[in-house]
């Protein structure tokens, strides 16, 4: 070989080696998130912030939603059959699925029917040894009255389970795809309980999902490693970091400095500028979301529907939408967004009419300067800046004689306090988890949810409750539509919420990120992400 050719050959080898070294470097995806998780057992919580850190990266359920849609597809169950009467669901479980192996748990077997039975029976059976590991109960299972839906769960063999229902339940498959249906390791839970460390099920999670939990630094970050044994294949990124960043301005700053490659829910007013940045891409989704203020109907004088209607007529919703969202939201009139089954577009919003609102308050015997304690969280989510929204409510209601006291708490603290019913009003954004109206209605407004604390309005209307119960049990779509319209009319007349907006949702990412897709249910899945 001539010297010059040898030199070229050597340089080529060096270049190839350098390229291989670069490709071999671990790829870390950092995501700036809006709030800290409350824990890592999805069955114990209802917050999307918690699910982003638990259900989506760590676990799988029997079924799932197709990326970017509400279509139910197989997950840990590779297929299922439903009996003609809608009462028996038989699931064939996926084989060869491994639970995470960590420094605190080494599984000795693969996922099987015992894990399905454990994951559901702990919620359903008060005598189950794992039931009391969640001191506040299982909010979704309780609010959905899962015990009144499921007659029994049977293990047919290692790879088949059967759910027998007490009555038909239209959204049952979609319900099972929700985060509360995440499948945990019965083997791991049994070891923890035997050692008297059952609480670690919520702090040292083990699942079958795309990422393995490595560390949580409270209120700062959650770290994960790619699951090398993931049944769908190892994720393209090696490490995932959820960087808890309450301030949306700081989330954007960190994104621009490449400290985060994805920033969740930037402020709507920042979206236009973000779209002009050549290093960034803005993703947009018409999510299933209703931002609202739940009014505690157990507190006087807000137990009177006239007072709640007065609040609706005293609030300038058009001004609020313009100030908080620009043109990035539509007004909310009812409890769920227009894209869902049975939405009644014939219902008209209560008009902005401060004088009529004052007259209603006077008719209800409400004296001027009546206090209202409005609970809000720190940070900013899809419903906009809570403090700014609260100030607008405060200003408008002052004009009709209601003095709003704003009380702001960290997210988890606000959830705890409002679940206990301390508030007169609470700002909240509910994002649908399964693409069905029932997810908005039964969980947030059903009578059973009053006792569990998930119904922040503490409102129980028997006519409303009966309508949504019948709709949930019917497989006749036209009947469901009629029942949901009946429920919406009752809601509109009673006004347990001040419905605010159905906002668009936004996430921002750097140009070198691909494979991330938003979901109408706001489920964040980072398992398909690639970093170029």
UniProtKB/Swiss-Prot annotation:
Q: Name one Pfam family in it.
A: SBP_bac_5
Q: Which GO terms describe its molecular function?
A: peptide transmembrane transporter activity
Q: Which GO terms describe its biological process?
A: dipeptide transport; protein transport
Disulfide bond sites: none
Q: Which residues belong to the signal peptide in this entry?
A: 1-24
Q: Which UniProt keywords apply?
A: Peptide transport, Periplasm, Protein transport, Signal, Transport
Q: Which InterPro entries match?
A: Peptide/Ni-bd, SBP_5, SBP_5_dom
A GO cellular component term found in this entry reads: outer membrane-bounded periplasmic space
User: Where can this protein be found?
Assistant: Periplasm
Query: Taking the first listed entry, what is the main subcellular location of this protein, grouped into a coarse class?
Result: periplasm
Q: Which Gene3D superfamilies match?
A: Dipeptide-binding Protein, Domain 1, Dipeptide-binding Protein, Domain 3, Periplasmic binding protein-like II
Physiological role: Binds different tripeptides. Probably recognizes specifically tripeptides composed exclusively of L-amino acids.
Family classification:
Belongs to the bacterial solute-binding protein 5 family.
Its protein name is Tripeptide-binding protein
Q: Tell me which species this is from.
A: Pseudomonas aeruginosa (strain ATCC 15692 / DSM 22644 / CIP 104116 / JCM 14847 / LMG 12228 / 1C / PRS 101 / PAO1)
């Amino acid at each position: 070989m001539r010297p010059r050719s040898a030199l070229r050959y050597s340089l080529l080898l060096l270049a190839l080696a350098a390229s291989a070294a670069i490709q071999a470097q671990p790829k870390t995806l950092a995501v700036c998130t809006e709030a800290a998780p409350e824990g890592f057992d999805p069955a114990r919580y209802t917050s999307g912030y918690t699910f982003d850190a638990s259900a989506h990266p760590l676990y799988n359920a029997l079924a799932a939603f197709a990326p970017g849609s509400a279509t139910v597809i197989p997950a840990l169950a590779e297929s299922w059959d439903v009996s003609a009467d809608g009462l028996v669901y038989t699931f064939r479980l996926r084989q060869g699925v491994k639970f995470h192996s960590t420094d605190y748990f080494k599984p000795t077997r693969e996922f099987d029917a015992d894990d399905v039975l454990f994951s559901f029976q702990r919620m359903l059976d008060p005598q189950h040894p794992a039931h009391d590991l969640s001191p506040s109960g299982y909010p979704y299972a309780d609010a959905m009255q899962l015990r009144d839906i499921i007659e029994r769960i049977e293990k047919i063999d290692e790879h088949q389970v059967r759910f027998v229902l007490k009555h038909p339940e239209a959204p049952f498959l979609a319900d099972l795809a929700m985060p509360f249906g995440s499948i945990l390791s019965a083997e791991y839970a049994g070891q923890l309980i035997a050692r008297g460390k059952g609480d670690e099920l919520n702090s040292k999670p083990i699942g079958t999902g795309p990422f393995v939990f490595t560390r949580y630094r409270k209120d700062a970050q959650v770290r994960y490693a790619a699951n090398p044994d993931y049944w769908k294949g190892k994720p393209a990124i090696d490490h995932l970091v959820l960087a808890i960043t309450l301030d949306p301005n700081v989330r954007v700053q960190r994104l621009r400095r490449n400290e985060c490659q994805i920033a969740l829910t930037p402020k709507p007013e920042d979206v236009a500028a973000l779209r002009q940045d050549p290093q960034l891409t803005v993703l947009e989704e018409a999510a299933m979301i209703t931002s609202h203020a739940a009014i505690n109907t157990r507190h006087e004088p807000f137990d009177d529907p006239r007072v709640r209607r007065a609040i609706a007529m005293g609030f300038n919703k058009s001004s609020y939408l313009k100030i908080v969202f620009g043109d990035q939201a539509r007004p909310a009139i009812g409890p769920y967004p227009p894209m869902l089954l049975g939405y009644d577009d014939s219902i008209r919003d209560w008009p902005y009419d401060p004088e009529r609102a004052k007259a209603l308050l006077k008719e209800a015997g409400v004296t001027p300067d009546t206090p209202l304690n409005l609970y809000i969280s720190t940070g900013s989510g899809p419903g906009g800046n809570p403090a700014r929204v609260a100030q607008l409510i405060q200003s408008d209601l002052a004009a009709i004689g209601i003095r709003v006291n704003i009380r702001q708490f960290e997210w988890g603290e606000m959830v705890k306090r409002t679940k206990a019913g301390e508030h007169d009003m609470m700002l909240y954004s509910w994002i649908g988890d399964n693409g069905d109206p029932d997810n908005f209605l039964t969980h947030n407004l059903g009578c059973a949810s009053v006792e569990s604390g998930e119904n922040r309005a503490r409102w129980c209307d028997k006519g409303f409750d009966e309508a949504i119960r019948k709709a949930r049990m019917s497989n006749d779509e036209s009947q469901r539509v009629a029942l949901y319209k009946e429920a919406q009319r009752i809601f509109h007349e009673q006004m347990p919420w001040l419905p605010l907006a159905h906002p668009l949702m936004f996430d921002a990412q750097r140009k070198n990120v691909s494979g991330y897709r938003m979901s109408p249910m706001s489920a964040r899945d980072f398992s398909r992400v690639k970093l170029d």
